[in-house]
Structures are given as structure tokens and as C-alpha cells.
Amino acid sequence: MEVGFKALLDDLDVLEKSLSDPALINKLRSHVENLATLSKCNPHRRSKVKELSSEVVDSNPYSRLMALQRMGIVDNYERIREFSVAIVGIGGVGSVAAEMLTRCGIGRLLLYDYDTVELANMNRLFFRPDQVGMTKTDAAVQTLAEINPDVVLESFTMNITTVQGFETFTSSLTNKSFCPSKEGGSGVDLVLSCVDNYEARMAVNQACNELRQTWMESGVSEDAVSGHIQLLVPGETACFACAPPLVVASGIDERTLKREGVCAASLPTTMGVVAGLLVQNSLKFLLNFGEVSPYLGYNSLKDFFPTMKMRPNPQCSNVACLERQKEYMLAKPERDAAAKAKMEADASTTIDEGPLHDDNEWNISVVDDENEKDTTKAASSSDTLPEGLTRELPVADEYEKAIAIASGSGETEEEDDLEDLKKQLEALNAA
């Protein structure tokens, strides 16, 4: 297209020289230059893909992802288009997590943030300088739609810690328009918390406890050299209020802790690692492969990845969390019975193993070790030869027997030895 615009401009130059009044030509040239600029600003977008294909061609954006299914890692990767994921906080971690899920072909993304893109955000990933001044949600939708038009994107520019924002947040999570057949009170499959303050985390925690919604929490330290992710299942694992940070437990307003002129450090590397761990565990949770980490830390100074499990606190200050704990304990006998039945079913299932190789070119057979020993013993004890074969020399036993008979010292020598021993014993006793 750029070549065509350049040729058109060249033609206008030639035409300008042949006309006495070049004003009209200059006007046309201005229009062409504007069109050329617009064509550069609006890159080509691919068409939507109706069905995922594993065909390995350059034009298939999902061929590398579908290879996970072909290699046995995932049973059915196409299910990813049925899932909805909500991301709260489109900052250094949340924006990268949103991009990763978009490239993986997630079905629907719900994006929540109230901040705008600034030049100070350019040290991080995802956002571009030409998006400065836009809300982070609008900028994210713009970029993600260009990356993968198959993903349904819904943005909410609001603060979820306000009363109105919290109500909008919970109502959007319960919207099942994307998947009406989804069970439970929530319309999303997973909530990812990528916020940078405890107040917003507590708001997400409250909403997920009320809706019985599984969610994952993530964060990066103020010095930008460590981070963590955590899986939170209401009633089964500790919620964010079960073991709150000191700032939350003491009731201090965290806004008073921020010093004027001092900002937290930010490294795109640390945020990229945390976002990768977050999305990796999200995919394992959604597509049911591997093991989801209940808590995974990251210390970049020592490349240390601590893991742990956090049980719910029976004395948690969150009322909704206590209710979920009671529900989980009441359902425990049913879960144990189901697990026992599954274990028995797996144990009773016998797999008929066929031959490792159908063809046996060299007629190799497997012989039992015990039978092989018996066969060897029987063969060694038998002195019979096949018909038509004779021994040139006698066997060792026959040879020794013949020498003993010839010398006449067979049994006589043994008797003499016994007599000598008897006399020696009598002499010892007499002494």
C-alpha cells in the first residue's frame, strides 16, 4: 500500500509541472499524505477464527497452542474459548497477564482499573507512548483487540473500593451472558488480582468470598526484586483476611505510609516473571493439567522460589469466609466418599497390556527365570547325547573312577584314614 501511495505522489509531481495553477495538485497531495499516514497508524488485523485447528501452517495463530494437546499435556485445549477471566488492576503485572491470556486464546477477559497511562509507566511492559492519557482499560482493549480479535473484551473504568464500584464489580462477575449454562453464582471461572494496594485486595477478597469465587492474588515488592502468587479457594484455603499483613491487621491507612517524593521501584523483569507464573498457574487451573501452586514466591536476588500451603483461619475476621469454611467442612464426608470410590475404581480397572511390538522379526521370546534355571540344571545333570553322537574322551567322573579302580585304592584308603583318626583320638583321650 505504501508503494501505491508513493507512486501516486510521484504522478502528482509530474502533473504539477504541467499545470499553471498547482493549488489543486497541492490539495490532492495533502489528501494522499493523510491517507498514507492513516494506513501506517491502522495496521492490518487478521480475521476471526471460528474453530481452533492443529494444522501447522504459518497462517494458523493457534497451531503452537494446539500442539499441547497433540503432545498429551492438555486433553482438550479448545475448551479455553469457553472460559472467562477477570483481571483487577491493569498495571505492570495485570497488563502482561492480560496479553498472555489473549495470546493463549482465552474466551473472555474482564478488565478493571481506574488509572490512566502515563510516561512513568513506560519502564514496564505492554503500554506504548502514543497511549499516554488514555485510561488503562481503553488502552488495553485497543492493544489486545489487535493481538487477538477472537477474545471478547469487557472493560470497566472504575475504583472497586468505592461503594458504587464494588457493586458494579460484583454484578459484572455474576453476569452469565457469555456462558449461560455455567454453574454457581459467578459468571467467571477465575479472578486475577493484580492490584498494588491492600484496600483493593480486601475488596476483591470480600467479593470472591461472597460469590464463592476462586481467585488468584499476585504482587511485587516495593523494591521490585521479589513477588508472589497465591491461589485462594473460599472455605478451602486461607482468604486474604485469614492472615492479613500488618498494615491491614493494625487498621493503618496505607496512604499515610507513602512519603512525598518517594515512589516504589519497578522492574519489568520481575513483573514479567510474576505475570508468567500467574498465567501459567491460571492455565493449569482452567485446563486441568499439572499441579497448581497454592502459594509461590519469587526472590530474584537468589532465584529462590518458596512454596507453601495456607489453611483457613477459624477465627478469621471475614464473616463470608467463616460461612465458606462451614460449607466446606459439611461437604467433607461427601468429598471423601467420592475420592474413595474413585480410588477403588482406579484400582479395579485392569489394563490389558498387549505386546510392546507387534512384529517379532527375530522370534525373540521371554522365558521365566525359574524355568530357565530348571532347564539348565536338567541339561547339566543329563549325560545322554543326541542320537549319532559319541564322546571321544570319557567324562571327568568316569575318568577318576577308572583310575581309582585301576590302582585299587578306592575304598581301602578311606578305611585306612578312618582307622588312623580313630587311633589319634584314643591317644588324646588316654593322655
Swiss-Prot record:
GO terms for molecular function: ATP binding; metal ion binding; ubiquitin-like modifier activating enzyme activity. The keyword Ribosomal protein does not apply. The keyword Nucleotide-binding applies. ATP binds at G92, D113, K136, N159, N197. Keywords: ATP-binding, Metal-binding, Nucleotide-binding, Ubl conjugation pathway, Zinc. It comes from the Eukaryota. InterPro entries: D-isomer_DH_CS1 (IPR029752), ThiF/MoeB/HesA (IPR045886), ThiF_NAD_FAD-bd (IPR000594), Ubiquitin-activating_enz (IPR035985). Gene3D superfamilies: NAD(P)-binding Rossmann-like Domain. PANTHER family: UBIQUITIN-ACTIVATING ENZYME E1, UBIQUITIN-LIKE MODIFIER-ACTIVATING ENZYME 5. Belongs to the ubiquitin-activating E1 family. UBA5 subfamily. This is Ubiquitin-like modifier-activating enzyme 5. It comes from Arabidopsis thaliana. The lineage of its organism: Eukaryota, Viridiplantae, Streptophyta, Embryophyta, Tracheophyta.
